[in-house]
Amino acid sequence: MAGHSKFKNIQHRKGAQDKKRAKVFTKLIREIVTAAKTGSSNNPENNPRLRNALTAARSQNLPKERIDKALNSANESSNNENYTEIRYEGYAPNGIAIIVEALTDNKNRTAAEVRSSFTKYGGSLGETGSVNYLFNHCGVIQYPINIASNEDVLEAVIEAGGHDIISDDTTHTIYTDVENFSKVLDFFTGKYGIPEDSYIGWIPLNTIIIDDKEKAAKLLKLVEVLEESDDVQRVFGNYELSDDVYEIIQGEP
């Protein structure tokens, strides 16, 4: 795994998402509906994807009544909402690889929006598979650092069958193989409660350090615009901000 400093970028993006709570909720609800409709069962006990979606929703404080409404909606025979999972890959300026995961009911619309965003901010959208070799596809589970000691969490990772763990000043980040994600997430949820975040995503094998404020601002604007789309679930990139640039950007309104 690359160094933990890349999570500065995740935390920066997470902060931007927190300011757009309605959009975050929309994405969570879309995943719940999709998981309930496409899984083997609409019972989370028998549907790992739905169980994962519900855990993610609770970690973001999606109100219970909205979760229940989404589940009821998915079970209605009149519900014609069908979403397709699509992955877009391309490059931001300065050779930064970007992966965009989307759930959409209109592939043409979403592709046009994603392509337009890449172009507007100096990037280029490539073919699916053009950059994913630069990333590790894995499960990620995050807890606040004070949930337990590094040693205790490491023991839990080993017991649960996790792949790796990185602990920094604020966060325990647990990595899992995609195949074991649900099992490990269930174990940690039972032991430590709902995590701060949990998902299957793309973690860069190596990162490019951005040490120029203007370059960082342009890159983060592209990421922000992509994430503002209701169709986009998550955005990943193989970059990290230098300490100086990170502090400057964090200090801006």
From Swiss-Prot:
UniProt family annotation: Belongs to the TACO1 family.
Superkingdom of the source species: Bacteria
Protein's UniProt keywords contain DNA-binding: yes
Name assigned to this protein: Probable transcriptional regulatory protein A1G_04400
PANTHER family: PTHR12532:SF11, TRANSLATIONAL ACTIVATOR OF CYTOCHROME C OXIDASE 1 (PTHR12532)
Any single GO CC term annotated in Swiss-Prot or TrEMBL for this entry: cytoplasm
Keywords: Cytoplasm, DNA-binding, Transcription, Transcription regulation
